[in-house]
């Protein structure tokens, strides 16, 4: 299929972006663990695993189409944030950024008239709607936390979610 070389390059860039996302969320997991927020740490580790799965799935797709998946340079991720809220605001901003990257991939597939890739990538578009909504929901709840006890309660709840999906 003639469209694959152009898409292959774009998807390989996305593979690196997904791996960077995985590293970012793993770094956040370590940050939360250091602060004693085991629930947030567990939830972020689950998110890290999901991003790595995205990279694997993208690589598998390139291979199925007869292309070659590559791992490009992955930049260093932040290690510290100002607060729990700041970290989750960064998660939300990052998920919005990932959505824009996925949208651009869909645009490339569309311009190349590659229906199979469009179909494959629409799954990521749908998933990003959920990822953004989840991150924004956590941010909005954290903004309502007025004391450490309420943050600890949220930490416990996110931990239950993180452990349930590992």
Describe the residue ranges of each PLM region.
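Acidic/histidine-rich alpha-helical segments that form the ligand environment
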Residues: 10-17, 21, 25-28, 32, ...
């Amino acid at each position: 299929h003639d469209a694959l070389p152009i898409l292959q390059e774009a998807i390989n860039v996305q593979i690196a972006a997904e791996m960077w996302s995985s590293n970012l969320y793993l770094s956040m997991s370590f940050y939360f663990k250091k602060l004693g927020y085991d629930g947030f740490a567990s939830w972020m580790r689950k998110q890290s695993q999901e991003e790595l799965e995205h990279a694997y799935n993208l690589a598998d797709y390139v291979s199925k189409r007869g292309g070659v998946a590559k791992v490009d340079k992955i930049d260093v991720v932040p290690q510290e944030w100002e607060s729990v809220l700041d970290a989750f605001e960064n998660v939300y901003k990052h998920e919005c950024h990932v959505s824009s990257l996925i949208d651009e991939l869909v645009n490339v597939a569309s311009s190349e008239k590659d229906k199979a890739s469009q179909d494959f990538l629409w799954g990521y578009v749908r998933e990003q709607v959920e990822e953004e909504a989840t991150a924004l929901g956590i941010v909005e709840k954290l903004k309502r936390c007025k004391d450490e006890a309420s943050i600890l309660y949220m930490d416990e709840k996110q931990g239950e979610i993180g452990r349930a999906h590992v």
